[in-house]
């Protein structure tokens, strides 16, 4: 057995079987399909166009349009790569024509696109729930206010920068303004209300206990399919493409989850979590100093690694330590999520930069990196605020579920 006892192979079979039969994880392909179908319906482009025309006379209006659309579609797609790519395609051309600063524009697009990893129904939170033995509905409720906090920090930062230097976000030229505000409001309504209603119905049914995450994901997927049909964007070829994309993304996530789960189980059988917990507790350090060390470690691991191995391997190893320190696990899960979101904006392996560069080749990669690092600092500020004020994450779950 190549140096392994036969029990290791039994353990591998058991772990793969447990992951593949976990009912909560059945929500993953359904949420992925929901996001892809809403993306194909073209609602993101329609909403962005209407919002930018509504604020055409406001300095930095395209920054606000990007962030507003990011929040709405983060809740719809939950796929960072897709969000950054679509935002880049939509916004970069308008920003270039209007003379917007490339660095600030790139930072806004990439930061807005990464909100999908945090704002419910985040696929990462769906996976993290069973690993940490936390109800997914608690994680969804806990992630809402931190997501809004980060989006608000982004908006405040762009506003302050544009107030100090108006050239960073000039008002839109006349040829990019609407001839009739009535048409703008119709476009805004058609672009916002249907996807928002679908997202709020799916998310609300989870938060208020009307449906499990898997049931809500199924309803959301069907709703997105009907929405695409209503907007006359659904064709057989597009449906086939969406199904293939869903299969590819889901297969990748599930295999990584199963393999990482097996790897973590082997570590647990070797006693690694216990050794780590006993060692760090034996140092008699301040528990918040240990928390800071954990956050730095996760942040550094987020540079070369995807979120799946970190959530599936690292988190189970440090979970006994976090419990021994007396930290609230729901709060800790949100800290991890925000931390991993920060890693998407951290050079040199920031994948968001490459997604954006792929669709906006005229922007220099150095400028994209510089813009992202500004928002990475905002992410760290947001993370520190959630550590100092745990109620940012815990207030809504406590209000809804009393725990």
What are these regions (language model features)?
Residues 1-403:
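Alpha-helical transmembrane segments of multi-pass membrane transport proteins
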